[in-house]
Amino acid sequence: MKLAFMGTPDFSVPVLAEILAAGHEVVAVYSQPPRKAGRGMAEQPSPVHRFAEEHGIPVFTPVSLKGEAEQQAFASLDLDVAVVVAYGLILPKPVLEAPRLGCLNLHASLLPRWRGAAPIQRAIMAGDAETGVMVMQMEEGLDTGPVLLAERVAIAPDETAGGLHDRLSHIGASLMVRALAALSRGGLAAAPQPEEGVTYARKIEKAEARIDWRRPANELDCHIRGLTPFPGAFFEIARGGETIRVKILRAKPVAKSGEPGKVLDAGESIIIACGEGALEISGLQRAGKAAVTARDFLRGFALKPGESVA
């Protein structure tokens, strides 16, 4: 089929790759404009933008699709369908209706649970046992369209947002190719989303990254995994008038107790008491430093039982 692909981050790239491998005619790629990044703060194209250029596909990076000129340019592509995967811009009604078969969106949750910007992180942070990917027919509401295909995925007890992100990206790529094949044959039925069970996966805020040791250890375990690798859950240690920020990369709940935020053990691992239970930390990273094991961290940083962290 003749289509446009609309996406921006790493999550979207495997989907575009699978669509190309399946032999579809991708006549245009839409991605968010280049952003300043890196030490030199030079403008960097998005991962989807780079992939498309490497494969000789025309790339468009409008700051908005609300203008009539952009909408007419999109309509002039004369598409069978548009595929949207983590694009990041709102698609107005004229854009949604321009392709002959509309716009398909790949969403990384079991809708209507976790509509919105951060479904992968929120599913782990909430302690969900499973999530999934869904292909839906887009409409003007936020992730409200009818579902065309879905695949459920179990969340492993030690899975991080980064690991789940990569798994769902590849599962979703295969699902989207299946959806396009069925759509081209006219054999894809749409099922409306249930009205009950709606939750919203709001964007991750910086303030959420600080660990609140008053919470139960099992909740903090989910919280940390949901924020790994980005932005990373952290705590702070006061040292001689200096505040040192430390990210937790790997931890697990253990059956120990103490005053929340107090170090219970600092040997092969670091154990810190929580509101209920404790966290045994095995991987950490100081700001601006490399990731290390707890043992290596303690070689360069004295942290003693009885000390409190914030």
Curated annotation (Swiss-Prot):
Catalytically driven reaction(s): L-methionyl-tRNA(fMet) + (6R)-10-formyltetrahydrofolate = N-formyl-L-methionyl-tRNA(fMet) + (6S)-5,6,7,8-tetrahydrofolate + H(+)
NCBIfam families (UniProt xref): fmt
Protein name per Swiss-Prot or TrEMBL: Methionyl-tRNA formyltransferase
Annotated gene: fmt
GO molecular function list: methionyl-tRNA formyltransferase activity
Physiological role: Attaches a formyl group to the free amino group of methionyl-tRNA(fMet). The formyl group appears to play a dual role in the initiator identity of N-formylmethionyl-tRNA by promoting its recognition by IF2 and preventing the misappropriation of this tRNA by the elongation apparatus.
Gene3D superfamilies: 3.40.50.12230
Organism from which the protein derives: Parvibaculum lavamentivorans (strain DS-1 / DSM 13023 / NCIMB 13966)
Enzyme class of the recorded protein, top EC level: transferase
